[in-house]
Curated annotation (Swiss-Prot):
Enzyme Commission number, as recorded: 2.5.1.145
Protein family (similarity comment): Belongs to the Lgt family.
NCBIfam families the record matches: lgt
Function comment: Catalyzes the transfer of the diacylglyceryl group from phosphatidylglycerol to the sulfhydryl group of the N-terminal cysteine of a prolipoprotein, the first step in the formation of mature lipoproteins.
Single Gene Ontology BP annotation: lipoprotein biosynthetic process
Protein name: Phosphatidylglycerol--prolipoprotein diacylglyceryl transferase
Pfam family, one: LGT
Keyword Transmembrane helix: yes
Naturally occurring in which organism (per UniProt): Actinobacillus pleuropneumoniae serotype 5b (strain L20)
Topology versus the membrane: Multi-pass membrane protein
Keyword Transferase belongs to the record: yes
Location(s), subcellular: Cell inner membrane
Residues given in the record as a 1,2-diacyl-sn-glycero-3-phospho-(1'-sn-glycerol) binding sites: 143
Superkingdom, taxonomy of origin: Bacteria
Length: 264
């Protein structure tokens, strides 16, 4: 029966290793994502008529890099794997094993943006609107890393493109990581970069990002397998959806505020 479905490609999560040092696909995907964000940010700085300098973008990307890494890891552990942390405190530091929370990473990036805005004496919303269109590609690369790591797969299904994941018991499952790659990494990227082609009120780009990501994440959660270690609310809403709802509301509030200020 399972012959009709797609076999998970056997990809070694480690690309190569030299002694105790190993380069993993998961880490490489993040580096590619940040590399692309850096390149795109520099390109936008050169076309910003002096609003941004390449030095300022360099500082912003570097600071946000650490915000994502630290916030993403801490968020994953505290939001989704707190019980495991209590059993094995060193789990927090084994980032190479995978496990990065977008919501934790977002908190880390917000802290980084506040610090950079203060240092550069610019509006927080100016910083947020600049960084938002740089994020989706990196999100998509992270989902590719999840796919290669054979983690965060979807629920059991009989769709023709179902994948037989080894850690999922070789049962046909939704490749939910690839759904998120397409929606969060590709579709959202084009939406935001189309949106910024015209002048927009301060905060509107960041607001649209929050709405777009959260709606896509909320929808994919319906086919993403529920982590048995993470509670749901009466089996009606997942932890990921619960964390996404405030972001949808917040994004809408920011958009309304941004456009109401413009009219005023």
């Amino acid at each position: 029966m399972n012959e009709q479905f797609i076999q998970f490609p056997q990809i070694d999560p480690i690309i190569f290793s030299i002694g105790p040092i190993a380069l993993r696909w998961y880490g490489l995907m993040y580096l590619i994502g940040f590399g692309f964000a850096y390149w795109l940010g520099m390109r936008r700085a050169k076309n910003s008529n002096g609003v941004w300098t390449t030095e300022q973008v360099d500082q912003l990307i570097y600071t946000c890099f650490w915000g994502v890494i630290l916030g993403g890891r801490i968020g994953d552990v505290f939001f989704y794997n707190f019980d495991r942390l209590l059993q094995d405190p060193m789990f927090l530091f084994r980032i190479w094993e995978g496990g990065m929370s977008f919501h934790g990473g977002l908190i880390g990036v917000i802290v980084a943006m506040i610090w950079v805005s203060f240092r550069q004496k610019r509006s927080f919303w100016n910083t947020a609107d600049f960084i938002a269109p740089l994020i989706p590609f990196g999100l998509g690369m992270g989902r590719i890393g999840n796919f290669i790591n054979d983690e965060l797969w979807g629920r059991i299904t009989d769709v023709p493109w179902a994948v037989l994941f080894p850690s999922g018991g070789y049962l046909p499952r939704h490749p939910s990581q690839l759904y998120e790659f397409f929606l969060e990494g590709v579709v959202l990227f084009f939406i935001l970069n189309w949106f910024i082609k015209k002048p927009r009120p301060a905060g509107s780009v960041a607001g649209l990002f929050l709405i777009g990501y959260s709606v896509f994440r909320f929808l994919v959660e319906y086919v993403r397998d529920i982590d048995p270690n993470v509670n749901t609310v009466d089996d009606l809403i997942t932890r990921g959806q619960l964390l996404s709802l405030p972001m949808i509301i917040g994004g809408l509030a920011i958009m309304i505020w941004a456009y109401s200020r413009k009219k005023a």
